[in-house]
Amino acid sequence: MTPSPHDLLHCGMNSQDRDETNGDRQRLVRVALGQEDGDLLVRGAQVVQPVTREVYAADVLVAGGRVAAVGPDLPARARRTVQARGAYLAPGFIDGHIHIESSLLTPASFAAAVLPHGTTAVVAEPHEIVNVLGPAGLNWMLGAGRTSGLRVYASAPSCVPASEFEQGGARVDAAQVAEMLARPGVLGLAEMMNYPGVLGGDAGVWDILNAGRRSGKRLDGHAAGLGGRELLAYAAAGLHSDHEATTPEEARERLRAGLWLMVREGSAARNLAALLPVLRDLPRRALLVSDDVSVDELLELGHLDRLLRTCVAGGLHPADAVALVTSQPAEYWGLHDLGVIAPGYHADFVLLRDLQHFGVLETFVGGEEARPGGETPPLPGGGVDLGPGWDGATFDPPAHWPTLQMFPDQIVTGRAAPGSGDARLVVADRYGRGEWSSCWTLGSGLRGGTLGISILHDAHQVALLGGSDADLRAAGRALERLGGGIVLVVDGEVREQLPLPYAGLMTDHAPAEAAAALGRVTAAARLLGCMPAGRL
């Protein structure tokens, strides 16, 4: 049986090209010549062309999931016609760097959240799940993307664990990275966070870089805080991009060094407003990415469409803004048949009300109305195992240990005098080693009860913040039963919970259900005096 475009859309450019036959392309040519009817005809659109930076009136004819012809008043017929009535037709939006796990959603649920906002493809950086499960996590992410309705590509995580001080569920070496890079749909090496290892000549890091170079694919960068000679040396190592610039000066320095500029705007870091002046002047070797974005923000604010609104409000020409999420991420990642509405390209496009608010009327993937996929495939392993000694555990830290000082709305911490804390923080190994450590904290505001979570970047151990040993133990066991997630325990009872049974990081529930559960846990924690920020 010949696969449909929806069956193939997950596979990536190389897999789709292998599955395509001469007959498919010959039919596309016949449709383009008017010798055969197409499958879809979009009449009367204002087509956004990011390559030439223009908007022009045209019809778009589609056959076999690809664009056959684009032009004004096409003398063409198709099995189905959509009347655009002057609405704008832009290429489908591409998020060039995102950790899907940070949304708390599986790929299918994530697709349900972003397809209505015009996103048709993402390049997932799955180092969260790979820290839990190793390369099997990347395999699962790609497999789960196959039926999601979204084109899910990936990059191969380069830093698992993120540092030598972390102990997670996996250690990934250069040979495993090379295997991941060889898989269809893997577009390059994921962000090389270990820049000290790059600059210091660490043998393991350079073996991984060499695996990336041998693959002939992209080497994604992560150069937080680097400048001057160090940034030049990092670029000289062969990295191609960076998404850590926070100031216009840093952004320009990266562009001068030959790096592609990924401008990050998500839930954890928001750099777009600061970098808009650079995008206005130098919009060509740049792309917009979300990096980490939470489910509640996806539902409330949107995805790449909200970044486009910010760009246009900040003075970018709409075609320049659209290029940042279409042709330019496609060019960077080598997705040569995405990002433009042109003959031979995949028929991924978005019908928009206007080019100021970017309200989405309809999203098309492979020439069909986008529809989120079906069931999420099972994921063996990746749960929580605190070990048999947990039930008798006590969590008082040594008296001379310093207290961890927390600050409202900050991710930085400080030190306070020993014995000055108001709640204990326990970090417990979730991978069956039966280990844990604890310290006192000051500034959490928590009055009674315990918060527990299995999301702890990047090793994703279990973190518990609370008072009594009994509640700390109960919260840990609750996370075990759920297979991971977020819980709030008071007097030994679970008051609120968000199960995340996929690697302790994701749920396959509908986005609205996941956001509601997250909201209930957060609200309950605030009632107990704790003021969790973001995703707790």
Swiss-Prot record:
It is an enzyme of class 3 (hydrolase). The keyword Manganese applies. Residues 1-24 are annotated as: Disordered. Keywords: Hydrolase, Manganese. Its EC number is 3.5.4.2. GO terms for biological process: adenine catabolic process. Signal peptide: none annotated. Gene3D superfamilies: Metal-dependent hydrolases (3.20.20.140), Urease, subunit C, domain 1 (2.30.40.10). It catalyses: adenine + H2O + H(+) = hypoxanthine + NH4(+). Its cofactor is Mn(2+). One of its GO terms (molecular function) is adenine deaminase activity. It comes from the Bacteria. Belongs to the metallo-dependent hydrolases superfamily. Adenine deaminase family. This is Adenine deaminase. It comes from Deinococcus radiodurans (strain ATCC 13939 / DSM 20539 / JCM 16871 / CCUG 27074 / LMG 4051 / NBRC 15346 / NCIMB 9279 / VKM B-1422 / R1). The gene is ade.
